[in-house]
Amino acid sequence: MQTVRVFDTWVKASGRTLHFDVITSNEATALRLANEYVASQGHAAVSVTAQECRYCHAEPLVMFSEHQQRQFHESGGFIVPLTA
């Protein structure tokens, strides 16, 4: 069974807090995906670091949807938006 790593991410941007999980296999990919996600939310000037994007725990990949599993295999991971 394939296991993925969950990176809990909190980012302050333009007076609001973005909270999301990055599901991937390593920290470098987590930071890349986190920065891409933050930029897609209109905050390209914000840089996500390992201080905001921290490894939290591991989960089996099969617990996520087929779409998310496909994203993991095609892009190296995916984002799960959460409420702040």
Region locations from a protein language model:
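Short, charged/polar N-terminal "headpieces" of proteins
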Residues: 1-17
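Acidic, low-complexity intrinsically disordered segments
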Residues: 37-84
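Short, flexible N-terminal segments of the mature chain
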Residues: 17-43
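Generic structural motif
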Residues: 12-14, 25-27, 84
